[in-house]
Regions:
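ASCE RecA-like P-loop NTPase motor cores
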Residues: 1-168
Length: 168
């Protein structure tokens, strides 16, 4: 039976992370974990074992630390996201690339997902961020600009229809 801890939530595959931690080679990686601001690059893991490692790291590093997975393609990023959501549960998000669309013609679903991911990142809600190299290189609005783009509607408040339509 898998038990939720402060660093590892109860998920369907949480037992996989528990078993993973008992491997000798994983303990060797644990001894090499980088200090804040340093980087550790690992590769060569087949199938979903990379996601198991990333999920284990997210639990091991705990709150305030972020594991970033940079996938080669958008479909690889989606695969990583699905695997990590099953292993880690909440605290995993995808920062998608714009799929080759010009800045002037944004795809609104992708733009919305990017904003939601940035907001979760800034709130400290993420333990694992999945993205692509291309997405990480694309220009993105700074947090103040993201807040300026937000339009909140509350029950009982009056809004000019032109403002609502202009925002939409």
């Amino acid at each position: 039976m898998t038990v939720a801890t402060a660093t590892r939530p109860l998920t369907a595959l949480g037992a996989v992370l528990d078993a993973f931690e008992r491997c000798a080679s994983v303990r060797a990686v644990a001894d090499r974990l980088p200090a804040r601001g340093e980087v550790l690059r690992l590769g060569g893991l087949p199938g979903s074992s990379g996601a198991v490692l990333a999920g284990w790291l997210a639990g091991r590093l705990g709150a305030g630390r972020l594991v970033v997975v940079v996938a080669t393609t958008p479909s690889d990023a989606e695969r990583w996201l699905g695997d990590l959501q099953q292993l880690v549960g909440d605290g995993v998000a995808l920062y998608p690339q714009r799929e080759g669309l010009a800045e002037e013609e944004p795809h609104y679903e992708i733009a919305g997902e990017r904003i939601e991911t940035l907001e979760a990142l800034l709130r400290g809600d993420l333990r694992v961020l999945v993205t692509t190299a291309r997405a990480s290189a694309e220009r993105t609005a700074v947090p103040e600009a993201l807040e300026a783009l937000r339009f909140r509607i509350a029950v009982g408040e009056a809004y000019r229809i032109t403002r609502v339509l202009g925002t939409l």
